[in-house]
Every structure is written in C-alpha cells, then in structure tokens.
Amino acid sequence: VGGRGRGRGTAAAARREPGGAMAAGSITTLPALPEGGDGGAFAPGHFKDPNGGFFLRIHPDGRVDGVREKTDPHIKLQLQAEDRGVVSIKGVCANRYLAMKEDGRLLASKCVTDECFFFERLESNNYNTYRSRKYSSWYVALKRTGQYKLGSKTGPGQKAILFLPMSAKS
C-alpha cells in the first residue's frame, strides 16, 4: 500500500473503489499521488531542529537520524496530507516513510502503515511538532547529538520535539 499512483490507507483498507480511492470502513481516502495531481503531497523540503541544528534524515536502509549537512540528499522530505492535521513524512531519496514503532523507536518503512501518520501542529513559537497518531502522547524528536529520541521519552514543551520545515531550495 502506498507509492505513486496507488491508493493509500490504513492497514485495514478493505477495497479499491472506482477512480482508485481506497475504502477503509466507511471512510474513503484518495490515492497518495494520483496521475496529474499531487494528492495532498507538498513540495519536498527539510525539517531542521532548533535544538542542535540537525536536519531530520531518512536513510534507504530504514535508519532515521539527524545531520547538520544541508547537502545530504536524504534530508529531502515530503509531507503527504492524510486528513486535516494528519500527515505522513516520506524521505524522497530513500523512498521510505517515517514510522514510530510501539517501543518508541523511529525508523523508515517501505510502505505506509498506521505507524506512519503524525499530527502536525504549528506551535505558538512558530515551530512544528509531529505527534504520533497511533501512540498519541509520543513525538518525533532529535537529541542534541543528532540521534532520534525514543517517543516514550518525549512530551509537550521539550525542545527536542520542535522542527522548522524549510523549503528544499533554501
């Protein structure tokens, strides 16, 4: 499930409807990137944390970390809207989706699962936070060392959970 031109939904998505939409119970989700449209995908960019100056990086082998080099190709990320305020985060070069596992680890999944959706919120300080939809009290976070922080160790008000979305051109 997921990828260009195919339907995207939760692991419980039951059937494909006319026009390529997927039905998940009584909720219909549109294809992630339909032919000739962006399907809720935003222009690729970078996510920089103000804590250590790291860019969130998704590796092709599934690892997730932070790096300070703005030229690293694996920091190019694409947000895809799933619902109002809910996004998935795709590593463009890695062709993988950011996921939070049940033990709080961050990794990159080859396909979209229910662990790949995050509530995106613009905080009062103008930074964004990404809170797991499945594990609702856990956030995407980077430590000052550039390593990801376990979701179970995160919470509101921590600097580690703040990100500044930036254009890939800047």
Curated annotation (Swiss-Prot):
Classification via InterPro entries: Fibroblast_GF_fam, IL1/FGF
Annotated site residues (Important for interaction with integrin) in this chain: K143, R144, K149
Listed Pfam families: FGF (PF00167)
Keyword list, A-Z: Angiogenesis, Developmental protein, Differentiation, Growth factor, Heparin-binding, Isopeptide bond, Methylation, Mitogen, Nucleus, Phosphoprotein, Secreted, Ubl conjugation
Record flagged with keyword Nucleus: yes
Organism domain of life: Eukaryota
GO CC, alphabetical: extracellular region; nucleus
The protein's name: Fibroblast growth factor 2
Native source species: Cavia porcellus
Gene name of the encoded protein: FGF2
